A protein has these predicted regions:
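Short, compositionally stereotyped local motifs that mark structural "simplifiers"
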Residues: 1-168, 367, 485, 495-514
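Short, well-structured beta-strand/strand-turn elements
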Residues: 55, 238-252
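Short, solvent-exposed loop/turn and secondary-structure capping segments
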Residues: 60, 69-70, 98-100, 127-130, ...
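Zn2+-dependent metallopeptidase catalytic core
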Residues: 150-158, 227-241
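Active-site acidic catalytic loop and adjacent metal/ATP-binding pocket
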Residues: 186, 331-381, 476
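ATP-dependent phospho-/nucleotidyl transfer catalytic cores
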Residues: 199-210, 215-220, 224-225, 256, ...
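C-terminal catalytic region of ATP-dependent kinase domains
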Residues: 362-489
Length: 515
């Protein structure tokens, strides 16, 4: 500074495309310390804040970032209700400090972990710039992928704060964008201090670092069970299919209760790399992730689909009973993941093909994984079986059925597919052993959270929720036997063949899947 000069200074506000402002600072103030521990208190608390001598503290209680015009700290702040306090230090010759933030929950206990997120109203509810509102433009604000800064704190179920850092957020998902309670993606960014969230958020994952997280409002399940996607993911445990781990939590937005969410892993190159054990940064950056059939440019979520398109064209035009053709496919495709994916989704009755997903790291095979499976356990409909088991020349219904059809033309793979169906039912769908305990875990937790959640977001009653969950459990109980019948018919199995494949499985179902 001045513009074109050789003196480097900090500016209070960026001026992209314009001349720099006149006022710059050679250094910035030191972030103040909120001396009183964030967390849960039975009654009102006095919150003390300190900063180096000569620096003035300004603070807010509405979630916004303090400015030089914010309320000046003159002594401990009396907090009598759940409140977010954000503080910055200022001095005449220094740029304002980074922002300290702490949430104080007053007579507001929780049985589950709590995430407190806060940011300026301009990023949330402003009609021009806020992502939580429709706005005045032709495209709703919440449909835009605007990414804004946000401060987050994570408190474990015992009330201890385990994480506090600046990050960014975006509105995510599809069906929930227009809801009052939206799903939010959280992203750790180096520009805000760290490119990871360093905590073990999920009991069934060994990971302690995440590049992003998902606050999932349960999307299309928000007025039904509020757990289907999470429950069904856990039921798939042991099949080798990646699914997004889940933890029911409560969220506070700018200090206000904002309902039950399921904290989730965010399915992206980083979480898939953790799952697959890939650690090379270059390989992670080169990950290919596709959706639906994977054959259209619009199906590419990350990387490229060139290799996948070549593979699909190959299976459409080659007989896999030729060993060399079969080898070409099995060298490029993780067949176990395909079979496990299809069988699992047929059993749960997942008809939502918009969420078909597959990935590949350099030098690896194309691998299917589970993503947004909350459409499962909603009916006794046979249509999901039809979606997956179409003839090789049939029109796709959102799933790349060509490769499955080609493999099932090979007798040993048809045999393996049927045997694998029996194995998956026995390992994952014996109701009282493997399904009911997972449902009950979520029922016990979410059932306690619902009364307050419903007050905040009406539209679901406890009575209806109970009925919806019971119905989902009944579909999970009864569909395995029905799938056996459908497959037996579609593959033209004789009575002897059905017994050979499924007699033991049916015997177990008669023991564990009865009301």
């Amino acid at each position: 500074m001045p513009a074109g000069g050789d003196t480097w200074l900090y500016l209070e506000a960026a001026t992209p495309g314009k001349a720099n402002g006149k006022n710059g600072y050679a250094a910035r103030a030191q972030e103040p310390v909120i001396e009183t521990a964030a967390g849960f208190y039975e009654k009102a608390v006095q919150v003390a804040i300190s900063a180096p001598a000569g620096q003035e503290i300004r603070y807010t209680t509405d979630g916004s970032e303090p400015t030089r015009a914010s309320k000046r700290y003159t002594g401990p702040i009396a907090v009598s209700k759940t409140t977010v306090i954000r503080a910055r230090a200022f001095a005449d010759d220094l740029l304002g400090s980074t922002t300290a933030g702490s949430t104080f929950f007053i007579n507001d206990p929780s049985i589950v972990p709590v995430m407190s997120v806060y940011t300026g109203d301009a990023y949330l509810y402003n009609q021009k710039t806020g992502v939580m509102v429709k706005g005045s433009g032709n495209i709703p604000n919440y449909e835009k992928d605007w990414e804004y800064p946000i401060q987050i704190e994570y408190f474990d179920a015992s009330g201890q704060r385990q994480l506090s850092q600046m990050a960014t957020f975006r509105v995510t998902s599809h069906s929930s964008r227009s809801l009052r309670q939206k799903s939010l993606g959280l992203f750790a960014r180096k520009a805000f201090g760290s490119n990871t969230f360093d905590y073990a958020f999920f009991d069934n994952r060994p990971y302690t670092q995440y590049s992003s997280l998902l606050l999932r409002s349960t999307n299309s399940d928000h007025r039904s069970c509020r757990m289907r996607d999470a429950v069904l993911g856990e039921i798939s445990e042991g099949l080798g299919l990646y699914y997004q781990a889940a933890q029911p939590i409560v969220v506070y937005l700018n200090g206000e209760y904002f309902g039950h969410y399921n904290l989730r892993e965010k399915a992206n190159k980083d979480s898939l790399a953790q799952w697959a054990g890939v650690t090379d940064p270059a390989a992670i950056r080169a990950c290919d992730i596709l959706e639906r059939t994977g054959t259209l440019d619009s199906n590419v979520l990350h990387g490229s689909n060139q290799d996948w398109v070549e593979l699909m064209n190959f299976v459409k035009s080659h007989d896999l009973n030729d060993p060399s053709n079969l080898q070409y496919v099995t060298d490029r495709l993780d067949v176990d993941s395909l079979f496990n994916y299809v069988i699992f989704n047929m059993i749960i009755g997942n008809y939502d093909v918009t969420n078909v997903r597959m990935y590949r790291f350099p030098g690896g095979k194309w691998t299917f994984f589970l993503h947004d499976i909350e459409a499962g356990c909603m009916s006794f409909d046979e249509s999901p079986v039809d979606i997956f088991l179409r003839g090789k020349n049939a029109k796709a219904a959102g799933f790349p059925h060509w490769v499955l059809a080609a493999l099932l033309e090979v007798p040993e793979y048809k045999d393996y597919f049927l045997r694998r169906t029996a194995e998956i039912i026995e390992s994952n769908f014996l109701f009282s052993l493997q399904v009911e305990p997972v449902f009950n875990k979520y029922i016990d937790t979410i059932g306690q959270l619902l009364p307050r959640h419903i007050k905040k977001f009406p539209g679901l009653t406890i009575k209806d929720w109970t009925a919806n969950v019971n119905a989902a459990m009944n579909y999970a109980r009864m569909r395995p036997k029905r799938v056996i019948g459908w497959l037996s018919k579609r593959f033209g199995l004789s009575a002897a063949q059905q017994d050979a494949y499924f007699a033991h499985t049916l015997e177990l179902l008669s023991q564990y899947n009865v009301k």
